[in-house]
Amino acid sequence: MKQGARFLKKAAGAPANVAAAINRSGGRARLAAKVGHDPFGEFLLHTLEAEGIECAGVTRYATPTTLAFVGLQDDGERDFTFCRGADGELCWQDIPADFLEDVGIVHFGAATGLLGGELYVTYQRLLHEAKRRGLLIAFDPNYRGGLWGQDPQEFIARCTPWFLQADIVKVSEEELSFITDVKTSTEGCRRLHDAGFSYVAVTCGRRGTWVSHRDGMQELIPSVPVDVIDSTGAGDAFIGALLAKIVQSGCTLDYWQ
């Protein structure tokens, strides 16, 4: 990052990426978030609305909009630097009373949501309310060392209750490895199922996605071959498309449990 000479502004944030992928896959997404009263916040709101995302749960705050700087490497991989801001101030009073009405799945990401503070409290209350209503819960740990430090143990401890509450868990190969302390997706998923996880999708880059259900079903679904330019948001696009198709398939909560 310190060698960078050019910066290109892009709308992002994992939950917003997922919401956009849901809409582009034929679903309907609504988002709870908080942005600043600044040009970046205005840009994000405009982009969300252009994607057709329901934004009644997106509010403004005096704190500047959270920024993520992504440094691209030659192989398409990234390094991240974060400037936390308004996203951490999302409070329960910002969530519309009807936010969970006519909703099939509630998706949570952990990049900043589990760091603590007001956003963390709101996350917990929203999860509790979604479970009370019997809604399907999806969770993506979305580990970023720049937010949690290089020792993932605190991150794992924060994520574990969410893993156990989720019906669908999406992880990368790297996340699965350090969460379970094993190297293979087969054994890693088995450990998660033994701990109570229902359905796990492991994104494996160009090789595809390893899907595993605790009833014993495991399968590698190949990816469509592409030339990798920038992998930022690839996992978000995947889980967004998956969630849209799950709703469209009409699968019930009992199936995922």
Question: Which residues are covered by each model-predicted region?
Answer:
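Alpha-helix C-terminal capping segments
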Residues: 10, 17-28, 72, 245-247
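Conserved beta-alpha-beta core of the PfkB/ribokinase-like small-molecule kinase fold
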Residues: 105, 111-191, 197, 207-208
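Histidine-anchored nucleotide/phosphate-binding helix
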Residues: 15-24, 123-129
